[in-house]
């Protein structure tokens, strides 16, 4: 499908999938498939020659840094890594000034930080595209790669059921919004008190009403996973929650994705995890290393989904 003529994303920010239409998301996914094929065929494609992406990391990352940096290089551009040591954003210099200064030097900014408001403020003052590489509230780049992986394996998105089992964190938020946008049913199972934010659930349900999807939040993992096409989990204690790790281990134990739980999913279910994984905690080795697991294809798709983003926005 060639939708290049109809969809124009140049100069747009990528802060959350809620800001993108179903058609725009599908366009990015089809472009990612094309770019992945070019890469696999050894075809050089360098539309971003002479372009620079500034990557701001207030939270360290393996996949986000490597995939964005490699993606920019493969597209003919350059990526600049800025840690919180290099850039005292919002402390020494205001976010507004940082945004304006970087806009004079580079062609886009990718930021991975804690507060979602920081990304929104950066985007407000920057005159170049800003990409959300992760916040405490959202992880749209990962969700885009997840949609790509599901599409590759299942051949469609509309009407599938995704079950997310675990902490109602940024990943749960991103997946609910992503599923709602593309017409995929999403059931989230979290322990009491660890559910996704009510405002995000409400927003996802409103989007789902338009796309024909359903969004369900429950405290019962068996209810959520029933007849699921896609089973997804994440770590029980995210970065910054180390102090709560022991308590969370106890609370989340019944939410482990194990052989007994996945028997309730469809026989041809696919297992996804945004990684890093704690084997034996949120998921058993049998499931994560089993034949239904697509976690490395999923991790690889961060590169291709983000390349589609970069080509479209820059």
Swiss-Prot record:
Gene3D superfamilies: Aspartate/ornithine carbamoyltransferase. L-ornithine binds at residues 170, 234, 238-239. The keyword Amino-acid biosynthesis applies. It is found in: Cytoplasm. GO terms for cellular component: cytoplasm. SUPFAM superfamilies: Aspartate/ornithine carbamoyltransferase. Its EC number is 2.1.3.3. Reversibly catalyzes the transfer of the carbamoyl group from carbamoyl phosphate (CP) to the N(epsilon) atom of ornithine (ORN) to produce L-citrulline. This is Ornithine carbamoyltransferase.
């Amino acid at each position: 499908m060639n939708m290049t003529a109809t969809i124009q994303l140049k100069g747009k920010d990528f802060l959350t999938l809620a800001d993108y239409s179903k058609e725009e998301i599908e366009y990015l996914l089809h472009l990612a498939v094309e770019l992945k094929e070019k890469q696999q065929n050894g075809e050089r494609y360098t539309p971003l020659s002479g372009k620079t992406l500034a990557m701001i990391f207030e939270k360290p990352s393996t996949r986000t840094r490597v995939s964005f940096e490699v993606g920019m290089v493969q597209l003919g551009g350059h990526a600049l890594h800025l840690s919180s040591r290099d850039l005292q954003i919002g402390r020494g210099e205001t976010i507004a000034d940082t945004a304006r200064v970087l806009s004079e030097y580079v062609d886009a900014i990718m930021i991975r930080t804690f507060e979602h408001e920081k990304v929104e403020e950066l985007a407000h003052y920057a005159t170049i595209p800003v990409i959300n590489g992760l916040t405490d509230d959202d992880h749209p780049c990962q969700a885009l790669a997840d949609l790509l992986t599901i599409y590759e394996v299942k051949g469609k998105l509309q009407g599938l059921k995704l079950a997310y089992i675990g902490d109602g964190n940024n990943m749960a938020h991103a997946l609910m919004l992503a599923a709602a946008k593309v017409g995929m049913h999403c059931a989230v199972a979290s322990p009491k008190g660890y559910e996704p934010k009510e405002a995000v659930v409400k927003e996802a349900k409103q989007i789902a009403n338009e796309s024909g999807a359903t969004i369900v939040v429950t405290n019962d993992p068996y209810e959520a996973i029933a007849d699921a096409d896609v089973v997804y989990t994440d770590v029980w204690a995210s970065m910054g929650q180390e102090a709560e790790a022991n308590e969370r281990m106890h609370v989340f134990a019944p939410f482990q994705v194990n052989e007994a739980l996945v028997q309730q999913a469809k026989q041809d279910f696919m297992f996804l995890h945004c990684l890093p994984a704690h084997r034996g905690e949120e998921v058993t080795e049998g499931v994560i290393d089993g034949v239904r697991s697509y976690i490395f294809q999923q991790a690889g798709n961060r590169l291709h989904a983000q390349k589609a983003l970069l080509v479209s926005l820059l």
